[in-house]
Amino acid sequence: MNAGICVCVLLAALSTSSCLSLPAVSEDGGQSDLGIVMEHTRHTRAAPSSGQLSLLSKAEDDEEPRSSLTELLARIISTKGTYRRSPSPKSKSMGNNHRIKDRDYLGWMDFGRRSAEEYEYSS
C-alpha cells in the first residue's frame, strides 16, 4: 500500500517537473529560441495594475457582448432569408395522385372499424 502511494507521488513529481521545465536549447539556434521563450514568459507574467485591469475589463465586457450579439443577429437574419416557408418543389412533384396528399389520409378516423368490418367473425 505504501509502495503504491510512493510510486504515485514520484510519478506526479516527475510529470510536474517535466511540464514546467523549458525545452532543451540547441547550439545553432538556441539564442533566438531562448530569447523568444524568455520574452513570452515575461509577457505572460506581466500584468497591468488593478485599476487599469478593471477599467480595461469593463470596457471589453460592455463592448464585446454587444458586438458579438450584433454579429450573431446579422448572421441569423441573413441565413433566415434562405429558408422557404412554402412547400418545397419536391413535394409538388408528387402530383395529385399521391396517396398521402397534404399529409391527410381520407379515412383516418375509422381505421379500426374498417378492419373489423372486413373480417367479420362468426361467433
UniProtKB/Swiss-Prot annotation:
GO function terms (MF aspect): hormone activity; neuropeptide hormone activity
Family under the similarity heading: Belongs to the gastrin/cholecystokinin family.
Any matching Pfam family: Gastrin
Main location per the UniProt record: secreted
Secretion signal span: 1-19
Residue positions, PTM Sulfotyrosine: Y105, Y119, Y121
Proregion span(s): 20-103, 115-123
Induction per the UniProt record: By lipopolysaccharide (LPS); in hypothalamus.
SMART domains: GASTRIN (SM00029)
Protein name: Cholecystokinin
Tissue: Expressed in the ovary, kidney, gill, gastrointestinal tract and pituitary. Differentially expressed in the brain in the optic tectum-thalamus, hypothalamus, telencephalon, olfactory bulb and tract, preoptic region and posterior brain region. Expression is strongest in the hypothalamus, where localization is to the posterior ventrolateral region. Expression in the brain is transiently increased 2 hours after feeding. Abundant in the sensory layers of the vagal lobe and along the border of the sensory region of the lobe and the deep fiber laye.
Function according to Swiss-Prot or TrEMBL: This peptide hormone induces gall bladder contraction and the release of pancreatic enzymes in the gut. Induces the secretion of gonadotropin and growth hormone from the pituitary. Suppresses food intake and decreases the expression of preprosomatostatin genes in the forebrain.
Gene Ontology biological process terms in this record: digestion; feeding behavior; growth hormone secretion; peptide hormone secretion
Residues that bear Phenylalanine amide: F111
Keywords assigned by UniProt, alphabetized: Amidation, Cleavage on pair of basic residues, Hormone, Secreted, Signal, Sulfation
Species this chain originates from: Carassius auratus (Goldfish)
Keyword Ligase: no
